[in-house]
């Protein structure tokens, strides 16, 4: 039996591909062929269950029903959790089909770790539900122990930034009642005597973290589900998905096919893990994930390790999971092995471990727990895991096919997120939407041009894997999968120092660096797989300046952009925005139902509105411009009769908006057409006190308040080019948006810049928009306004036509909420001290935590940190305006509290004078 120290010595001295052979272990299998006999955790349990020792399919474990309300494909963590939660919701006729045995493929060999704290409030809630299910609910329902062990979790910080990140998690945890403690190196040593703490800055200890047993959990889940009437059928591989097209041209699921018969069903849930892409192809659904090898080793017995907490040493990219009197050691490396040809025969097999890839984890583990240097290796575990382009799962109804839901791509976190995600997916299926804001997991977050783009999926999934243990900084950007979607101004702005951000494939301006050009280069895989790592990469270097929880070096550059907008004018390239036309016979009925505001206005009007879901949550905020009918003139003026509307939505969420609108149109059977002109039109926003003077020299229209009021639009000519000018502002200033055909973008931009030179016009990016908009109190969807926030809670009641009798989606929920009182309310808080905040900070009121910050930034005009978050009354009652006003507030940042002032209105221009041109 090889010791870990010998592994390191042999790996360091042997040619590549020989190290494992010299250790007497299994030879390397670079071709990724699986082996079937390995001594691994859970294998014996799985092979010795009552159903028999063989894992060779012997036909279905029970007869197939002819019909089902829901068919879940895949018996891993997500499939079993979804089945269980559907059954708990009272859904009858639910069937789970597993091609082999429960947990085969990936779940059976997973480490089963559960950490309660992550840098996302939604994920903290999902993890809490998983913990509740495995530690309490299942045992209470079935009398069976799931294998849950509460031994605690310990996060290791070997630098100050990592410790700062942990302190942020601790502050967020206080909003959810999660106990955690930042420990000194000495306190860490007392807790974990075998640990080397000489290089530590500190640790974060979470006593109620623990581990789950995959086999025990899935077995108990399915027993509980079966007791409620669900069916579990093993040894029954799915071979096809039957689809029909209805009278409106909408594709819908009708049946699942297997070698043993078919099941008629309107709903399929793809929980097939690594095989989810194959199942998707059966139905014509794109599933953007890749399969990779993911490994850990199990040590021999270690004296004194019993009852120690699980460890995540993020800076060494390694975890140490307690396994009885031994440890499992694993992690995430920069050069994982892709499994390109996923075998449909693979079930309980494993890959041979590539020690050349895995060695770095051994080094990190020995440094952290030195006794491992002389500890033997009991077994190696290297199996397939699925990873996605943004390291978030794929969930929800596929936009290509109604009734086809995804629950896959969990990036090695399927066990810990399974309970929460299974519950949300069940609600999604039954009620049409989840209860929580699941946008970060919703398959509709990806633009359709990306979900079947192999290079983008592979590059982004690799980077997500390689950076899994990296510090999560607020303004990080990917290096992989860039330059997928660029507007006509890209090269022009690059030459002027634009530092770009990426949003759903689009390159959009982040900020402007006057010192150098920062081109985004092709992805170098961090030097792995024979790629040459980029040297002196300006964009990467500037991005590195963002790796801080303090103000970055270019904070002053963003300040100049903001102040120029407030005192003169700034031009923002917002071409990445989604731009849609809503036309057709029901183009008046559909907007009445879709939009919370009354958009039944005369042509030339523009309305800011929300779109809601049935529970009154906000699915989007957008602008809707009412059009005049006529003959088609350009992408700016489509031909239509009756009513027509032009919609502008944030580019990062455009696909989500597109899918939501189409789903509502289909469900209500509205005879409407939604046309996407996002790629045909650019969008320039010129904002600031001097914007009217600048544009008056460019546009052939009278821009006075009387001729061109706020919230109106006109077709005009800009430097001879037809554009749609809309008088709106995302930053709280006098200004206009110019919606410009792609071919005209560059000449129009140059004309604007030339006219603005004498007025102090500057380029500005989205970092400035973030600051300016929070200063004005404008909402950002998916930050301080989400699908689980109502407009009433968010202070947007003015966007809702509740004073009319017009029905709209979500109206009943809003009326009920208004009658019973708001149980939470969005508040604005400012801090006098110049301290950076980014969100997740705890909100204190009168000595109690009442919420956490959703969004924060520095306001350069008011010279204060500004934060927005939802607060609750700890007594459980409604949150009245008096409750908001009559409290002493503080914000906790990284364990330090700062006195804060609460505001009922935006602290900047509360009377809305500037957007009206009143200075």
Curated annotation (Swiss-Prot):
The keyword Ubl conjugation does not apply. It is found in: Mitochondrion matrix. The keyword Phosphoprotein applies. Pfam families: DAO, FAO_M, GCV_T, GCV_T_C. GO terms for biological process: choline catabolic process; glycine biosynthetic process; sarcosine catabolic process; tetrahydrofolate interconversion. It comes from the Eukaryota. Binds 1 FAD covalently per monomer. InterPro entries: FAD-dep_OxRdtase, FAD/NAD-bd_sf, FAO_M, GCST_C, GCV_T_N, GcvT/YgfZ/DmdA, GcvT/YgfZ_C, TrmE/GcvT_dom1. The modification N6-succinyllysine is found at residues 38, 174, 378, 392, 535, 803, 885, 905. High levels in liver, lung, kidney, thymus and oviduct, and intermediate levels in the prostate, seminal vesicle, cardiac muscle and neuro-intermediate pituitary lobe. Also expressed in pancreas and adrenal gland. The modification Phosphotyrosine is found at residue 778. Its cofactor is FAD. Residues 1-22 form a transit peptide. GO terms for cellular component: cytoplasm; mitochondrial matrix; mitochondrion. The modification Tele-8alpha-FAD histidine is found at residue 109. PANTHER family: AMINOMETHYLTRANSFERASE, SARCOSINE DEHYDROGENASE. Catalyzes the last step of the oxidative degradation of choline to glycine. Converts sarcosine into glycine. This is Sarcosine dehydrogenase, mitochondrial. It comes from Rattus norvegicus.
